[in-house]
């Protein structure tokens, strides 16, 4: 006989002697306060019901449970009883055995829920993990205490401090789950529960288990991982807190460890790093929302792409499409250039095979999706045509005339320009409404960011279709407006300019790189420039020189270095020296050039403190970001953060430049800019938006909310 109660976010059903509790809180069954309350209530009912001998907990929709509701972080709702950790204890203390039926992504509090149960059955497609460190926090509902007891210290440390999930097969090997479902998950879980009853197995509580290994061995293992984290996660607090909590599982009784975990979880949740990582999480999801474009806009299907230009960028773009299963026609003007482009793509794939990231068969399949051609006529059946040729307006004009002539009438026409005016390029065609910018970042097959440049006449369905395409080819798309450098590179310019000025005034390239890397960037500005190639920046600077005001401060250091043929790593020398490798070595030649420039300017070189270096680097880009918002070239300040997180290596645990400004306080940022303005002139004058927000004690985050309401 089956009875049920279907009200609320948890559905209660009796299937004979088995009580089935189904979490029903779409879209991902988070442990919101209503779910916790309902689960606790039905758990008590099932334990008091003499007809119920075992309990199965499952989830409706796409998964068992998506863990904590991130919207409850730092809100009173998170404290509503039972809190998640108390709920897991209630589950474990149940007198009747509980089986968790795991399917879909069962992460964070979802896995902790399953660990609170006595047994676990998983669907073969389930993914299981504790990703909290990726949000700047640690598991706070028993995960750091139960998982090491269940599967051993080494695998638990790996899972918890990395935040990476495992698949169901690996979970079975590790001992996280007891059975993989081969048919219907719920039926198999009920059958498993009946087997437990038949065997009189009873509840199996992880809290009573001992961690494998001696105390001395386990403490040594913890210490080994402490040292590793200093190298693998520099500056990140959450992995360190997580390891400390795991260490407590080794040296403390379960209840003590649980209390200590709760305290470490509280500390991590209140940290700037946690706030920054949560901001990044939501910012990425907001970036796909374009206020004036309806979510039900009819999209143009993109089943085939044409890429014009088989250079490094064009080849990388082609790889992005074929990696996602989209066939590509790769077009070049000469057979030699085409052959070189295909060879470069093959070489990239062979490297992936060599490193175990692809199989030979997968490489062959991806290469088979590329058709090479020297004729524009072959783009005729492509849904999107992306131009990726030399960054010169006359070259673009000629290419777009051909694209306009030979592409299909309803095709999307895109330019990969990083600096040129997309509005001008659109007018090279007879259908400017079909033209937009798709600014990929190099290497395009690796970098996640795609700036989607909306020109004045670009139609809404074109923008929406390319935003959807970005997701399909595993990119993070952000819509931006037309200006020199768009959003990311426009902000990069004042940042690099300040780096040059700091060098003229007293710092050395390695001083600036070290400060920026200590802040969290993987590479400082001078090392990045050497890696990218100084000739690229030099070409852009020469183009901009034509319109630069005569009274504007300008550093000729890049000119002088490039005039020596020093273009960075590829020539063995740039800002640094490279002796047969990639290690950047400070070079006396560069020091001489810098000292000569300081002398030429009659500057008395001085010791520049790290704080000043960091403020001049970051505040220059923040101020430019505020001007971009004023100009209407980005929809939200959080979109700017996403651009810098995915295109420029801004440290994720800082949230992005605009969110970092909010953390520092816009009043503090504005006051510092005023000081710099008095010292160095108008380029440092705070933007009107920044000053307005500072004067009203507001933030970029609050400004974003107001834009959404408009």
Specify the residue positions occupied by each region the protein language model found.
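Short, low-complexity disordered leader/linker segments with a strong preference
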Residues: 1-2
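Extended, loop-rich substrate-binding clefts of extracytoplasmic carbohydrate-active enzymes
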Residues: 13
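A structural preference for short, pocket-lining loop segments at secondary-structure junctions
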Residues: 16-24, 34-76, 89-103, 123-127, ...
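Short, structured segments at the rim of ligand-binding sites
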Residues: 109
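Short alpha-helical segment that forms part of, or immediately flanks, the ligand-binding pocket
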Residues: 112
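Small cofactor-carrier domains centered on a conserved lysine used for covalent cofactor attachment
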Residues: 130
């Amino acid at each position: 006989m089956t009875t049920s109660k279907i009200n609320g976010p948890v559905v209660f059903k009796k299937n004979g002697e088995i009580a089935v509790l189904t979490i029903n809180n779409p879209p991902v069954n988070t442990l919101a306060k209503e779910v916790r309350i309902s689960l606790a209530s039905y758990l008590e009912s099932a334990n008091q019901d003499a007809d119920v001998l075992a309990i199965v907990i499952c989830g409706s929709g796409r998964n068992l449970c998506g863990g904590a509701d991130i919207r409850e972080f730092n809100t009173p709702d998170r404290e509503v009883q039972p809190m998640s950790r108390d709920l897991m204890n209630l589950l474990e203390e149940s007198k009747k055995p509980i089986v968790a039926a795991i399917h879909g992504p069962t992460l964070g509090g979802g896995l902790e829920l399953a660990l609170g149960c006595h047994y676990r059955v998983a669907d073969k497609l389930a993914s299981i993990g504790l990703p909290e460190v990726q949000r700047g926090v640690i598991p706070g509902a028993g995960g750091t205490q139960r998982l090491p007891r269940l599967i051993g210290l080494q695998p638990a440390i790996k899972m918890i401090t990395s935040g990476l999930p495992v698949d169901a097969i690996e979970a079975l090997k590790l001992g996280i789950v007891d059975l993989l479902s081969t048919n219907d998950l719920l039926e198999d879980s009920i059958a498993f529960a009946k087997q437990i009853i038949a065997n009189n197995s009873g509840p199996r509580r992880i809290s009573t288990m001992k961690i494998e290994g001696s105390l001395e061995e386990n403490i040594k293992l913890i210490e080994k991982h402490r040292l590793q984290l200093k190298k693998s996660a520099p500056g990140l607090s959450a992995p360190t807190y997580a390891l400390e909590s795991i260490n407590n599982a080794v040296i403390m009784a379960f209840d003590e460890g649980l209390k200590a975990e709760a305290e470490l979880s509280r500390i991590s949740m209140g940290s700037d790093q946690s706030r920054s990582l949560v901001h990044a999480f939501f910012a990425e999801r907001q970036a796909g929302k374009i206020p004036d474009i309806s979510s039900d806009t009819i999209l143009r299907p993109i089943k085939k792409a044409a890429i014009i230009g088989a250079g490094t960028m064009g080849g990388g773009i082609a790889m992005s499409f074929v990696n996602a299963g989209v066939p590509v026609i790769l077009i070049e003007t000469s057979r030699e250039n085409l052959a070189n482009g295909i060879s470069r793509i093959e070489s990239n794939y062979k490297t992936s095979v060599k490193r175990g990231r692809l199989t030979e068969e997968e490489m062959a399949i991806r290469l088979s999706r590329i058709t090479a051609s020297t004729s524009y006529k072959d783009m005729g059946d492509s849904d999107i045509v992306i131009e990726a040729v030399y960054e010169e307006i006359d070259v673009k004009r000629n290419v777009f005339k051909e694209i306009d002539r030979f592409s299909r009438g309803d095709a999307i026409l895109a330019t990969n320009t990083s600096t040129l005016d997309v509005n001008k390029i659109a007018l090279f065609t007879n259908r400017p409404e079909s033209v937009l910018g798709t600014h990929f970042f190099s290497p395009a097959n690796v970098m996640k960011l795609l700036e989607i440049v909306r020109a004045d006449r670009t139609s809404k369905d074109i923008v929406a279709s390319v935003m959807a395409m970005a997701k399909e080819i595993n990119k993070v798309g952000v819509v931006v407006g037309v200006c020199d450098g768009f959003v990311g590179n426009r902000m990069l310019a004042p940042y690099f300019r300040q780096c040059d000025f700091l060098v003229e005034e007293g710092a050395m390239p390695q001083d600036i790189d070290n400060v920026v890397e200590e802040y969290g960037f993987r590479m400082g500005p001078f090392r990045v420039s050497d890696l990218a190639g100084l000739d690229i920046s030099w070409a852009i600077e020469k183009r901009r020189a034509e319109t630069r005001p005569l009274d504007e401060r300008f550093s000729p250091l890049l000119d002088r270095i490039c005039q020596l043929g020093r273009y960075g790593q590829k020539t063995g020398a740039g800002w640094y020296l490279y002796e047969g490798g990639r290690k950047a070595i400070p070079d006396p030649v560069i020091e001489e050039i810098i000292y000569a420039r300081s002398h030429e300017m009659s500057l008395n070189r001085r010791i520049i403190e790290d704080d000043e270096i960091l403020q001049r680097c970051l505040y220059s880009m923040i101020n430019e970001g505020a001007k971009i918002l004023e100009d209407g070239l980005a929809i939200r300040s959080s979109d700017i953060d996403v651009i810098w997180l995915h295109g420029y290596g801004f440290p994720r645990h800082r949230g992005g430049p605009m969110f970092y400004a909010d953390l520092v306080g816009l009043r503090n940022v504005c006051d510092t800019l005023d000081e710099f303005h008095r010292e160095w002139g108008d380029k440092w004058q705070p933007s009107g938006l920044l000053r307005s927000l500072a004067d009203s004690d507001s933030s970029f985050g609050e400004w974003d909310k107001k834009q959404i309401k408009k």
